[in-house]
Amino acid sequence: MKIDVIISADYIDSEALKGKIAVVIDMLRATSVITTALYNGAKKVIPVVSVEEAFEKAKELKSLGEEVLLGGERKALKIDGFDFSNSPLEYKREIVEGKNVIMSTTNGTRALNLCSKADKVIVASVLNGQAVAKYLENEEKEIVFVNSGTNGEFSSDDFMCAGYIISELCKNKEAELTDIAKTAKYVYESSEGIEEFIKDAKHYNILKNLGLEEDLKYCSTKNLIDLVFEFKNGEIKTVESGVKVTI
């Protein structure tokens, strides 16, 4: 198994991902939202790039009698006309269960759609990091951890999340790591904890200044969720893998 890391959505080469497994991370906060919404019973999550596409998709599904919720952000703030912002704490079971969630965010949903040519696209966060690592143990294809980044730039929170999952994966699986994958693993293993390390990150402080400390704490919590989610044919659903994940 070979493991690589892409540092932001701007560095994604969609064609180069063919034949590989992409593990998409937007720790703060899109993939944490997706993980939470599906864990809380959402029927599926549909990630789209633009706000206009989100409204069009919602209209289409509603015409078919489907229940739809819109979630996402621009500049970390809720989009006008959407039901939710990009806070995972808003996606409670009593609200999302059995419903379709359409999401559009600045970084995460863009990264997911750019990875659609990969053989498989897995959605990862700190919340389900160990479950993702356990699932990937059964794969032999090259794995590329895709950090969504922040507005095309490197983001240390996504890098730490990738390092965490790589570290967990390498406990039980021999792997050939690229230099950047080795660095992510080393940075995670040398840190005093994910949230402590990312406190100086630009995006962390944007969210902190908006009063979203509870989001930051939640998104930095390991292994709250023991499920794995796959983006396929434009939709994200729980993987039916038959893999027993013990946490």
Curated annotation (Swiss-Prot):
Alphabetical UniProt keywords: Hydrolase, Magnesium
Entry EC number(s): 3.1.3.71
Keyword flag Cell division: no
GO molecular-function term, one example from the UniProt record: magnesium ion binding
Regions crossing the membrane: none
Signal peptide: none
Reaction equation(s) it catalyzes: (2R)-O-phospho-3-sulfolactate + H2O = (2R)-3-sulfolactate + phosphate
Keyword Cell membrane: no
Root EC class: hydrolase
Domain of life: Bacteria
InterPro entries the UniProt entry points to: ComB-like, ComB-like_sf
Pfam families given in the database record: 2-ph_phosp (PF04029)
Reported cofactor(s): Mg(2+)
Database matches in NCBIfam families: PRK00886.1-4
PANTHER family referenced in this protein's UniProt entry, alphabetically: 2-PHOSPHOSULFOLACTATE PHOSPHATASE-RELATED
Similarity-based family: Belongs to the ComB family.
HAMAP family: ComB
Protein name: Probable 2-phosphosulfolactate phosphatase
Organism: Clostridium perfringens (strain ATCC 13124 / DSM 756 / JCM 1290 / NCIMB 6125 / NCTC 8237 / Type A)
Lineage of the species this protein comes from: Bacteria, Bacillati, Bacillota, Clostridia, Eubacteriales
